[in-house]
Every structure is written in structure tokens, then in C-alpha cells.
Amino acid sequence: MNRPAFAGRTVLITGASSGIGAALAREFAAQGARVVLAARRLERLEALAAEIRIAGGQALACCCDITRAGDPERVIDQAHAAGLSIDIVVANAGFAVAGRFEKLTLADYQCQFDTNVFGVLRTIQAALGDVRARRGSVVIIGSISGHISLPGISAYSMSKFAVRALAHALRGELRRHGVSVTLISPGFVASQLRQIDNAGRWHANAPETVPPWLLVSAARAARTMLRAIHRRQRERVVTGHGRFIVWIYRHAPWLVNAVVRLGRPVRRVVR
């Protein structure tokens, strides 16, 4: 019998209470990993951890707000207290600020960066000691919005371009320590991202703004992501439409710009 791909590994996942984060947790656990789940909504984490344990996996739920200094370090302390050291850190937590530039305030941009950029930094800095000692992996969940910036999502795109740059820089710095850095850039994945407002508050009844035929399930996306992580790939654009958009913008940006001029500004239609 083949050994599960991540057997014996411990994986820290931020933003694990829903969407891509929860799907990654289930898939890592199914492939033999111990998962440390971090997010603000502890009750959801505990329910997910219980689900994973019932299925025969190992999971630790930790309340964490990545915008608060010291919170990611406390998660690492909780993991150590449970006898766990982090092999793979997945900086997944994030949300999207949407709106035309003239309608947004500096505070909106600061709020966006505090979670999507500085939250990623806090997460990686907290886990890096373990990951480096175990020659593990750093995984950053970016977006196709880190490859192409459209009207109406300047703040979100700026944050995703920033973490894409971080991934490229870290890869060169950590290579000599045997640490891989994988940047995942999803397209439209079914998640709660588009139910979160510009202040980072979740609205359960907010409508989905992406047509169903464009959405890929979080479970399917997670399986693709795990293959990239297991192979220690540099970067993986997830979803077929995501790869197409990135490719066409790289080779024919004029075509994308022409289509954008015909349409409306993007409003919550983000990864």
C-alpha cells in the first residue's frame, strides 16, 4: 500500500474555518497530515477538527487573528504544547476590498494590507523556525488578481501582487535551507470570500456574484493545490479559466483591456 503523500507531516493552515482553507485541511488530513487549524471563528474550527478526527485524522483548532501581533506565535506555542512542529505553513487567510479608487479611503487600503500582506508576513515569520529546521514548505495563497489588476479591485490586486513578490523573494532566500516556497494563484473558487465586506466582516446572506458555471469547488481546487505543494512547485495557477486569463493577459494584454472597457468595474468578482 502506498504511503499517504503527507504522512507524518504537520501543516498549519490559516483561514481554515471555511472555503479553500477548510478544503485544504480536509485534503491534507486525508493524505496523512496532522493539521493545525487557525482562524478567528473558533466554533467553526472546532467543528472541522471534530469532522477530521471522526474520519481518522488528527487536528488541532486554534483561535487566531492574523492582524494581531502575537496571535500567530501563540498558535505555534499551542502546536508545540501538543507535541507538534510545523513542516508546512499555508498562509491562506485573506479577504477582498472592492470599489473604485475614488470611493475607497486610505483606511480601506490599510485594512486590506493588514490582512492580506502583513497577516501573511506574521504567519510565515511565526512558523519559519519550525519549517526551516524541518526543511519544509512555505505556501502562499495568492490569486489571479496578483497577475492581472482590473478596475474596482485595486486594493485587492495590490495585496496579491505584493505576496507574489514576497513568494519570489523568499524562494531565493530559503532555498539554501532546503525550504520550498509555493505560490498558489486561484481563479474563481467557491468560497465565502465574496461574502466578506470591505471591513472584513462576513455576511452569510450576501449573494454569490460569480456565475455558477465559472466556479470550481473548493475541494477540487484543494486537490490541485496539494499536488503542487507535494511536488514543491514554484507556482501554480488553479482553475482552467484562471490559467487562461493569466496566459491571455501575459501575451495579449490589449485584448483583456478592450474587454474590460466594455464592461463594468469588478465588484466582489474576485478569487
Question: Where do the language-model regions lie?
Answer:
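The beta1-alpha1 cofactor-binding region of Rossmann-like NAD(H)/NADP(H)-dependent oxidoreductases
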Residues: C63-R74, L106
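Substrate-binding pocket helix/loop in short-chain dehydrogenase/reductase
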Residues: R100-F101, T105-Q110
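Active-site helix of classical SDR
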Residues: I124, S159
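SDR active-site lid
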Residues: R175-G240
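Conserved glycine-rich Rossmann-like NAD(P)H-binding loop of the short-chain dehydrogenase/reductase
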Residues: A33-L48
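Residue(s) in the substrate-gating loop at a strand-loop-helix junction
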Residues: S143
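Conserved glycine-rich cofactor-binding loop
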Residues: T10, S17-S18
